[in-house]
Amino acid sequence: MKKKDTCEIFCYDEEKVNRIQGDLQTVDISGVSQILKAIADENRAKITYALCQDEELCVCDIANILGVTIANASHHLRTLYKQGVVNFRKEGKLALYSLGDEHIRQIMMIALAHKKEVKVNV
């Protein structure tokens, strides 16, 4: 027999609900959501992972790692840059990218560890 994944009656803990609703007003969930959305694209997740493996990569390196055009890699990198996931700098004719900070590396590594532990339905 399959278990229902919903409550069979409607009730809630008013104290918990009020406390958590108040907490939600004090944090930038929308900003967090935007960061996670940026990384959620498979190519951008690959870029993030690649930058976890090497401190700095140029656009050409990333394009070759992903097997995409430089224009496509640049598009994904711009999205990641706008969300603060990656940093960018120019060195001569090279456009070099690195992770925005250690938190991004941690997010990626934790997500990979979590994926190994649970079965994710796609």
Swiss-Prot record:
The name of this protein is Cadmium resistance transcriptional regulatory protein CadC
* Outcome after substituting residue 101 to G: No effect on repressor activity
Q: Which GO terms describe its molecular function?
A: DNA binding; DNA-binding transcription factor activity; metal ion binding
The entry marks the following residues as binding Cd(2+), namely 7, 11, 58, 60
What Gene Ontology terms for biological process does this UniProt record contain? response to cadmium ion
At the top level, the lineage of the source is Bacteria
Native organism is Staphylococcus aureus
Question: What residues are annotated to bind DNA?
Answer: 59-78
Q: What is the effect of changing residue 11 to G?
A: No effect. Abolishes dissociation from DNA
> What does it do?
Metal-binding repressor for the cad operon. Involved in resistance to heavy metals, such as cadmium, bismuth, zinc or lead. Binds 2 metal ions per subunit. Metal binding to the N-terminal regulatory site causes the repressor to dissociate from the DNA.
Give the free-text miscellaneous remark of the entry.
The N-terminal, regulatory metal binding site 1 has higher affinity for cadmium than for zinc. The second metal binding site has higher affinity for zinc and has no regulatory function.
Signal peptide stretch: none
InterPro entries in the record:
ArsR-like_HTH (IPR011991), ArsR_HTH (IPR018334), HTH_ArsR_DNA-bd_dom (IPR001845), Metal_resp_trans_reg (IPR051011), WH-like_DNA-bd_sf (IPR036388), WH_DNA-bd_sf (IPR036390)
Which PANTHER family does this chain map to?
A: ARSENICAL RESISTANCE OPERON REPRESSOR ARSR-RELATED (PTHR43132), HTH-TYPE TRANSCRIPTIONAL REPRESSOR CZRA (PTHR43132:SF6)
**HTH arsR-type domain location:** 24-119
Report quaternary structure and partners.
Answer: Homodimer.
Q: Which residues bind Zn(2+)?
A: 101, 103, 114, 117
Q: Matching SMART domains, A to Z?
A: HTH_ARSR (SM00418)
